[in-house]
Amino acid sequence: MKKNVVIFLVVALTLGAMVLIGGCRQPVPPKAIVRIVDTNKQPVENAMVIIKANNSDSAHTMVYFKDETKSVADTQYTKSDGVLEYEFKYESILKVEATKAADRQNPFVRRGMGVLVLENNKTTDVTIEINEQTVFN
């Protein structure tokens, strides 16, 4: 009888330790890679990229990046590779708007839109194609 109690206690303690060790892992905050390309699938340099919440008309809307919080929206510009990388605090769904001003090769403003669906432990990779026909509402 004593032997059964000892075996039961050892098994219970082992299972309890396994549950505690395995259940305490914090999720990795979501990350995103946004790629801006033209209609020829070439990267776009100096495109203005705005990330904002779906209901960004509210003055209380925030975008929670890993190291800072921005009111309503965050604006950055792409480098020559057309890529921007972000780290966020929370899972969320955000709108992405990209705009490239007119230049010698393209006499019209080009725009594109996309959506980031951010999940913990994942890096979301989104490619947004900009063109002359896209209109922001």
Roles of regions detected by a PLM:
Residues 25-27:
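Bacterial signal peptide processing site
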Residues 32-38:
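A short, amphipathic beta-strand motif
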Residues 40-67:
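Short, ordered, surface-exposed loop/turn motifs in non-cytosolic proteins
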Residues 80-95:
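Short Pro-Gly-centered beta-turn/loop motif in secreted/extracellular proteins
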Residues 93-117:
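A short, solvent-exposed loop/turn motif at the edges and junctions
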